[in-house]
Every structure is written in structure tokens, then in C-alpha cells.
């Protein structure tokens, strides 16, 4: 007892001293000084978490959502936590394992080998993206953090309940920090820029991120009937739908509809999955016949213009068609061998851009030598297409490997979703599995970038851990395992209770 009191007192004194020193160091507001001041407390916290330190692999990335460097959050999380994770293994507080799915592991490591080859033939070089920000080898860094995360998750020994609990906590953090990201430009417009959240005064996507996230969580957590019985959830779902519709982003509403359909199939809600689309189309046709759709905001009409039998404003339909034609024209450039936007379509041009080409592009833009920004998007690899951007970076070889990985991953994501759909932490698990299941579909048919591949590999690492946990816990039985055959007559004889004989002696 006295020993514990002494430890608590000693730690408290040291913490007070570090707090005073940290306050003096960070008084000037320098980010480096603040980081130095916070570092001792962060390291102490990592040490005190002991075998639970791997929780931070899942919980740290959501904290970066409001910041521009959120793409690199997994690299920070896994690289900082890994030494403490291995330290606990050395002290035997926890142990390592290998969560193995041989076929998936093989193709993922083949993809990493191919990316390494592309890096050696097209090394990292600093490029300038005149549309947004500086970039060059971001794709290589994304794949590096994906490799680190996949190896760490593959070595993680845990239970499905524990991992599901952490995933559920992460959803709460994602909601909180996405809300902060949404509120910041609304509360402080000067920090968001003059065009933040709008597109030519016709579309408003200020609430798009939080609306999509809220609706995803509601679809995963509640059925349509539950939302009807609880008006508050139904009202929240309707508000989220409105936030997506006024944005005018057709891909966002397509992802939500696809998620709704997948979840309905997962829970075998056949009636809802069939009747809901029919009722929705009937209502839209009724509103269209009464000219009501023409009074809706521009963003809503732009989304509905995808259905040719609905009557929307000509401006909304023309804007939507122009967007499609604009992209298709760029895609033709990319696949045309006479053009030079993609040099090596087989193995890829890598993730870094040629600085000389970009300088020429800057010159043309500065002197208005080009009358469209299509050229700028093309030179900078902003194709608005997952397959095209992947071909430019890692070629047909990389695209083929990713396609195979996606098919394998979707199979395991579906299996994991079916196994844990009724578990205590089903929300956290389904948030990973179902969103991954629809991710390749969106990548190939809606919108995607080559960096999405690295993000998908991290999700696959989590799915692999959940699948291996299910095998260890007896929740999954392989279809290749057959039970011992017992003839039907013997089964009936064993199930039939013994009848007493006339002599009173059991038969």
C-alpha cells in the first residue's frame, strides 16, 4: 500500500514539473515547442496503456479528420505505437500471431512488390500541383503506411469482441471530428475561403461529409421499420438525405443507396430491398408529373437528372451531362496511345509527376494559353476515375492485382459481415466490412483515385483480423470441412428415447 502511494506521489510530482516546463517551452506558440512539451505526456500515456496500446492504431486516425494531413494519419499512428507494441511483446504482456488468409496475403504482397518496382523505375520527385497543393510522392507514402498497417494488423492477437469495441469507439470519434470539420467553416467563414461549401451558388456541399456519415451509421444500426417507430431517428435520416441531395453529388447518393441495398441483403430484408426502390420511383414519377421537381434546389435536380424519365430543369440536366462528357473526353486522352499523358500503361508512370511538364503547364495557365482546365487536370493525374488514375500510377499490372484483391476482399467482407451482424459490436464491424464491400464498386464505376487502394488495404487488414478471430472462436466453419456422415436410420434411432420393457428392465 505504501509502495503504491509512493509511486503515485512520485508520478504526480514529475507530471507537475513537466507541465510547468512544457508551459514555459510552448508559451511562444511554436508548433515544434508545443509538440516537445506534449511529447513526455504522450509517451507516458503510451507506456501506461500496456497491452492495450494497439487500440491507438484504430483511434488515432479519426483525430486527424479536421486537418489537411489526415491522409497520413495511419502512418503516424502505426509508426509511433509500434515500438510500444513490440516492447509489450518483449515483456510478455502480449503475444504475436499471424492472421493468415494465404490467397489475400499473396496478392497484396505482389502488389507491394510491384509498387516497389515502380518506385525504383520512377523514384520520388517533388512535383507542383497548381490546382491545390504541393505533391510528388504521396502515393508511395500512402502505400508505405498501408504496408506497415497491414503487417501490424496481421500480427495482432485479439478477440472479435475487443476489436469490435474499439471499432465502435472509432465511429464515435469519426462522428465527433467530422462534425468539428463541418462546423469550423460555418462558425469561422474567413478560415474556409470564399468558395467553401458552394459551387457557383448552385450547389451547397457544406453538410455533405457529416450527412453521408450520419446516414451510413443509421442504415447500419436501424432498419426502416425501426426508424419509423422512432421518429427522431427518422427525422435525422431525412435531414441527412437532404444534406446529400442539396450537394448535387450523384456519387454520394449512389453510395448510400448501394449501402442500403447491401445491408438489406445482409439481414435478409427482402421486402424492404424490393419494395423501397419501387415506392421511391413511384413517388418521384408522381412528383415529376405534377412539376414539383422543378421547384427543388438545383443540387437535387442535378442528382435526379440521372433518371431520364423525370422532368427536371434543362440547366440541371445540361450541367450533369456536361460533367459526364468532360470526364469521358479526358479518359479518351488517357487511353489514346497518340497522347503522352500516360507514358507506360503496362507498368505505370509512378506517383511523382515530371517537373518539366508541370512547369510548362503552369506557363500555359498563367498566360491563358489553354481555354479549359481539362489539360491541367490531365497533366496532374486528376482523372476523376479510379481505373484511369491507377493505370497512370501502377499500370495495367497494378490495376489487375487490385481487381483480384478487391474480389477476394469483398468475399471475406461479406462473410465477416454475416458472422458478426447480430453481435454486440455489430455497428463497428459492419462499418468496416460493408463500406469496404461497396468501395471497389464505387472505385470502378463511380469515382476513385489510385491512393484509395492503400486505404482499402488497411481496411482489409482489419477484416482479416476479424475473420481469423471468427475461426479461432468457432464462429466460422469452412465449407470444405464436412462432418462425419451418419446414416439417417441411425440418427433417428439415437434421437428416439428408450421405451421401458414389460419386465421393467430398460431396453
Question: Which residues fall in each region the model found?
Answer:
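Membrane-interface helix-loop-helix junctions at transmembrane boundaries of multi-pass membrane enzymes
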Residues: 49-52, 90-106, 219-235, 267-275, ...
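A membrane-periplasm/extracellular boundary helix in multi-pass inner-membrane enzymes
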Residues: 242, 246-247, 264-318, 339-340
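Helix-loop-helix junctions and helix-breaking kinks within/between transmembrane helices
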Residues: 21-33, 68-78, 200-205, 231-272, ...
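Alpha-helical transmembrane segments of multi-pass inner-membrane proteins
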Residues: 39-44, 145-190, 200-267, 504
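Hydrophobic transmembrane alpha-helices and their immediate junctions
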Residues: 105, 377-383, 393-437, 499, ...
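Long extracytoplasmic/lumenal interhelical loops at the membrane interface
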Residues: 191, 321-325, 329-394, 413, ...
Amino acid at each position: 500500500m505504501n509502495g503504491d502511494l509512493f509511486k503515485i506521489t512520485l508520478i504526480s510530482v514529475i507530471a507537475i514539473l513537466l507541465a510547468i516546463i512544457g508551459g514555459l517551452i510552448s508559451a511562444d506558440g511554436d508548433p515544434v515547442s508545443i509538440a516537445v512539451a506534449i511529447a513526455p505526456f504522450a509517451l507516458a500515456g503510451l507506456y501506461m496503456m500496456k497491452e492495450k496500446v494497439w487500440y491507438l492504431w484504430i483511434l488515432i486516425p479519426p483525430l486527424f479528420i479536421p486537418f489537411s494531413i489526415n491522409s497520413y494519419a495511419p502512418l503516424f499512428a502505426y509508426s509511433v505505437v509500434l515500438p510500444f507494441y513490440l516492447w509489450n511483446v518483449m515483456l510478455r504482456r502480449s503475444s504475436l500471431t499471424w492472421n493468415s488468409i494465404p490467397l489475400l496475403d499473396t496478392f497484396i504482397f505482389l502488389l507491394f512488390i510491384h509498387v516497389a518496382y515502380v518506385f525504383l523505375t520512377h523514384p520520388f520527385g517533388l512535383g507542383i500541383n497548381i490546382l491545390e497543393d504541393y505533391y510528388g510522392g504521396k502515393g508511395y507514402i500512402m502505400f508505405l503506411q498501408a504496408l506497415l498497417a497491414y503487417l501490424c494488423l496481421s500480427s495482432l492477437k485479439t478477440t472479435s469482441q475487443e476489436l469490435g469495441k474499439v471499432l465502435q469507439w472509432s465511429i464515435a470519434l469519426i462522428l465527433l471530428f467530422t462534425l468539428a470539420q463541418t462546423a469550423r467553416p460555418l462558425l469561422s467563414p474567413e478560415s474556409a475561403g470564399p468558395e467553401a461549401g458552394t459551387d457557383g451558388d448552385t450547389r451547397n456541399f457544406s453538410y455533405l461529409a457529416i450527412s453521408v456519415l450520419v446516414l451510413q451509421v443509421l442504415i447500419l444500426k436501424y432498419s426502416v421499420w425501426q426508424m419509423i417507430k422512432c421518429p427522431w431517428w427518422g427525422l435525422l435520416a431525412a435531414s441527412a438525405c437532404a444534406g446529400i441531395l442539396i450537394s448535387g453529388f450523384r456519387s454520394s447518393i449512389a453510395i448510400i443507396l448501394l449501402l442500403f441495398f447491401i445491408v438489406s441483403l445482409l439481414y435478409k430484408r427482402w421486402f424492404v430491398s424490393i419494395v423501397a426502390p419501387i415506392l421511391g420511383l413511384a413517388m418521384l414519377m408522381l412528383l415529376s408529373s405534377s412539376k414539383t421537381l422543378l421547384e427543388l434546389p438545383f443540387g437535387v435536380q442535378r442528382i435526379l437528372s440521372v433518371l431520364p424519365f423525370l422532368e427536371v430543369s434543362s440547366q440541371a440536366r445540361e450541367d450533369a451531362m456536361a460533367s459526364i462528357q468532360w470526364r469521358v473526353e479526358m479518359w479518351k486522352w488517357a487511353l489514346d496511345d497518340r497522347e503522352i499523358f500516360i507514358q507506360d500503361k503496362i507498368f505505370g508512370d509512378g506517383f511523382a509527376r515530371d517537373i518539366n511538364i508541370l512547369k510548362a503547364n503552369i506557363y500555359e495557365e498563367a498566360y491563358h494559353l489553354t481555354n479549359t482546365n481539362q489539360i491541367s487536370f490531365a497533366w496532374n493525374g486528376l482523372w476523376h476515375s479510379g481505373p484511369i488514375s491507377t493505370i497512370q500510377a501502377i499500370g495495367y499490372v497494378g490495376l489487375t492485382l487490385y481487381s483480384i484483391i478487391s474480389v477476394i476482399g469483398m468475399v471475406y467482407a461479406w462473410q465477416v459481415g454475416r458472422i458478426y451482424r447480430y453481435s454486440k459490436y455489430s455497428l463497428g464491424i459492419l462499418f468496416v466490412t460493408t463500406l469496404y464491400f461497396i468501395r471497389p464498386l464505387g472505385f470502378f464505376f463511380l469515382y476513385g483515385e489510385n491512393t484509395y487502394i492503400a486505404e482499402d488495404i488497411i481496411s482489409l487488414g482489419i477484416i482479416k483480423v476479424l475473420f481469423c478471430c471468427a475461426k479461432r472462436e468457432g464462429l466460422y466453419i469452412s465449407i470444405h470441412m464436412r462432418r462425419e456422415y451418419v446414416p439417417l436410420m441411425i440418427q433417428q434411432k439415437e434421437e428416439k428415447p428408450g421405451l421401458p420393457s414389460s419386465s421393467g428392465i430398460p431396453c
